[in-house]
Amino acid sequence: MIAGMPALTHKQQQDAVERIQELMSEGMSSGQAIALVAAEIRENHTGGNVAMMFDDDDMINDSDDEYHFDDGEEEEEQ
């Protein structure tokens, strides 16, 4: 899948990070803060876009309720 993403300057990226951190410090979850800032950027962005390619396989299991994290360590036997 290819999607057009707003092309941001370093300053715009830094401003977005600071806005996300501000929202999180006010109690908003990181996911909500990122989604809100992304929506604000899309709504207000007047510059160009860059094409981003996403692997369609990444989208297949988005509805899974179970997530796993592999830290590279072997599990201890119980």
Swiss-Prot record:
Signal sequence interval, chain numbering: none
Residue ranges, annotated region (Disordered): 49-78
Segments crossing the lipid bilayer: none
Highest taxon above the source species: Bacteria
Extent of Acidic residues compositional bias: 54-78
InterPro entries, per database record: UPF0181 (IPR005371)
Coiled-coil annotated residue ranges, if any: none
A UniProt-annotated Pfam family: UPF0181
Stated family: Belongs to the UPF0181 family.
Name of this chain's protein: UPF0181 protein ECA2377
Species, as recorded: Pectobacterium atrosepticum (strain SCRI 1043 / ATCC BAA-672)
Source species taxonomy: Bacteria, Pseudomonadati, Pseudomonadota, Gammaproteobacteria, Enterobacterales
